[in-house]
């Protein structure tokens, strides 16, 4: 992280169409966003869908980006949502009677996992991502690129035990 910038970690996933192409297009669009620079990408792993049934497995990866001080967490979230929409994602939110979210297949999904050492809780954004520690499809790639500083800032997330759902 350079002076005036924040180290941010994003999770990307796709289980429809040309999954690799959607991930690469999303990364290119992120990198061309003013104030956002993609620094490192994890390997891409293939995983079963989480929270719903689908014949299509996901490709998932994590990326570390540097975000300068002109980019707020909320504006980065908006950028991620705009990229998802441009790449064909339908942001229809469906919930079960118990209040839990119903998940669907998608061309691209971009989640803000960590935003520096900040903890954010707003109506639209929660950081650290609330379910990331439960999801190997997030944690396996994230561990590949996480710096010691970020691991030390969130010891509760970087637990030693992992389930094995990645292929």
Label each region the model flagged.
Residues 16, 69-73, 141:
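Short, surface-exposed loop/turn motifs that are enriched in glycine and acidic residues
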């Amino acid at each position: 992280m350079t002076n005036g910038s924040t180290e941010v970690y994003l999770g990307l996933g796709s289980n429809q169409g040309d999954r690799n192409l959607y991930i690469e297009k999303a990364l290119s669009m992120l990198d061309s966003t003013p104030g956002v620079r993609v620094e490192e990408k994890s390997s891409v792993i293939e995983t079963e869908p989480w929270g719903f049934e689908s014949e299509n497995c996901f490709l998932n990866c994590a990326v570390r980006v540097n975000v300068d001080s002109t980019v707020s967490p909320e504006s980065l979230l908006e950028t991620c949502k705009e990229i998802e929409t441009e790449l064909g994602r339908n942001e229809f939110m469906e919930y079960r009677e118990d209040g839990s979210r119903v998940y669907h297949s998608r061309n691209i999904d971009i989640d803000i996992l960590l935003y520096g050492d900040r903890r954010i809780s707003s109506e639209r954004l929660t950081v650290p991502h609330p379910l990331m520690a439960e999801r190997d499809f997030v944690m396996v790639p994230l561990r590949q690129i996480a710096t010691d500083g970020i691991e030390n800032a969130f010891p509760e997330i970087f637990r030693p035990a992992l389930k094995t759902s990645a292929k």
